[in-house]
Regions:
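Preference for protein termini
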Residues: 1-314
């Protein structure tokens, strides 16, 4: 069966009509795309103009194409409960969230400042501990917190950041300003899914993506890759990503990120220590690891120093 396209002479769709009416009548408190009077916000104007040229059948076909790409790419999310595990497709929001450059620059500046604060606080907890000694934070915040790893005290006096990656969940508050809903600093995931989402969305709206001045994601990953190899320096050996393994819900992302960044993907059972150096088992014998980027919860990384029941770490 042939699909209908915008070149078939069909009238422009009116999918936004009833939606805009709800906004105009106050049925919704706020909206990213439409102003309270139902007009399209400037950042969305070109996308909405493009969207309205597509028939409902064409939109359905394009949405299905984006979903099919994710299935073909093997983008899955694993779910677990006490008795079984299951896989489900990674949910793709077919309509992207669009914001102008000035709004994103404001958000970005705030998140960078927040990340720098988190880095300062975390480093202080494991070095001088001035926040506790000065009384700004209660001592029990650390001493009774199972996430505080005592063996790490004094080991963070290097120049490298403790937080190599950090993620934030954000949302727009009632006043219209963006709020941070949660800080994700313990092996934050979904960066790989962001790439796949972008690729899928670009296939859904290829005409729009080719003409719009969209901020690219590649720069972030290039900078992060360079950071990892800068930390490695001239040391002999591989840069590896340590994953909990196949049963982890984010394992598909770990494989994608490792391949995208040119890293060796390893699990705890792949690693050994020889003469005080981390090594990875290969068919050609043990090879040195110069830098290990862990995607494990920190207490699970070292069963000798942290959680003795862990079978995931090195």
């Amino acid at each position: 069966m042939q699909r209908q396209s915008q070149s078939s002479g069909l009238p422009r769709n009116d999918l936004l009509g009833s939606y805009a009416a709800q906004i105009a009548t106050g049925a919704a408190n706020s909206d990213e795309m439409l102003a309270p009077d139902g007009s399209v916000k400037p950042a969305w104007a070109s996308f909405v103009a493009y969207l309205r040229q597509l028939s409902p059948n064409e939109l359905a076909f394009r949405f299905a194409r984006g979903d099919q790409y994710l299935r073909d790419a093997g983008v899955l999310f694993r779910q677990y409960d006490e008795t079984l595990s299951s896989e489900r497709e990674w949910p793709l929001s077919h309509i992207p969230v669009i914001m102008d450059e000035s709004e994103w620059q404001q958000i970005s500046a705030g998140l960078i400042e927040r990340a720098e604060l988190l880095e300062f606080v975390l480093r202080d907890f494991y070095t001088d501990n001035t926040l506790v000694r000065s009384g700004q934070l209660p001592a029990t915040l650390l001493s009774q917190n199972p996430a505080w790893l005592r063996p790490m005290i004094g080991m963070s006096r290097q120049n490298n950041n403790l937080l190599n990656t950090v993620s934030f969940e954000i949302g727009r508050g009632p006043s219209g300003k963006w709020w941070v809903i949660s800080d994700l600093i313990e092996a934050p995931s979904t960066a790989g899914f962001a790439i796949e989402n972008r690729i899928a969305t670009s296939r859904v709206f290829s005409g729009f993506f080719n003409s719009a001045n969209i901020h690219r994601l590649a720069g972030y990953f290039q900078n992060f890759q360079q950071t990892l190899f800068d930390i490695k320096g001239d040391a002999e050996g591989e840069v590896a990503l340590l994953s909990p393994g196949l049963l982890n819900e984010y394992y598909p992302e770990h494989t994608y990120i490792a391949r995208y960044l040119g890293l060796l993907l390893v699990e705890g059972e792949d690693l050994i220590v020889q003469s005080g150096k981390a090594m990875v088992r290969t068919v050609a014998g043990a090879k040195p690891i110069s830098l290990l980027w862990s995607r494990l919860p920190s207490p699970m990384f070292d069963p000798l120093e942290f959680n003795p029941t862990s079978m995931l770490g090195a």
